[in-house]
Amino acid sequence: MLRIIIFIILNFYNPALTSMKEDIISKMQITNNLSFNFTHTIDEKSENGMCILEYPKKIYCEYDGANKKIIVSNGRSLVIKTNNGNNYYIYPLDRTPLEYILDKEYLISKIKMLEPRSIDNKYLNFQIFENNNEINIFFDKKSLNLVGWQTEDIYQNLSVTFISSIRINQKIDQKKFKLPQNN
């Protein structure tokens, strides 16, 4: 019986992961915004670009490529705008997984309750289930930076976002989060 208890303690309680989790929470608490490059993949189709994320719930992303898509959230609504024809689509933010990903306090509260999973000895993953959304959040084990997330989009497609060239607490022009107007 003692062997079983020792086995459970050694295999399921990892103080190093617990310490990293606490360090991730501390780093998130002092982070007001992130600027980063990204690769966003849905059903094997990838797009690249750059984003500015400001807590709580604001994001501005410019996609590379022919249509120069822009995604903006002002904290309440999410707008996807394409430059070909100046069409845009508006969604209530609370109907998307970004409602949770862009909410630092929500993420911190969930991370406090979850045990991280180590992936390839490079990343820590926290798996969150909320309102029929499965959200996987990934942090780099060395830098403890947020490096991506995985969700399902509104059409039930697997959506994976990897982020790189991360800059923390940069000066941000608040006009970036103004929702685009139809021309």
Model-assigned labels for residue ranges:
Residues N84-Y123:
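Flexible, surface-exposed loop/linker segments and immediately adjacent secondary-structure boundaries
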Residues S26-S46:
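A short, Trp-centered hydrophobic/proline-enriched beta-strand micro-motif
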Residues I4-F12:
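Sec-dependent N-terminal signal peptides
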Residues A16-T18:
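Boundary at the C-terminal end of the N-terminal hydrophobic targeting segment
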Residues S109-N183:
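Gly/Pro-enriched, hydrophobic low-complexity segments
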Residues I30, L53-K58, S73-S77, D120-N121, ...:
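Short, solvent-exposed coil/turn segments at beta-strand boundaries
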Residues I6, H40, K57, Y63-N67, ...:
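A mature extracytoplasmic/lumenal domain signature
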Residues C51-Y100, S159:
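An acidic-aromatic
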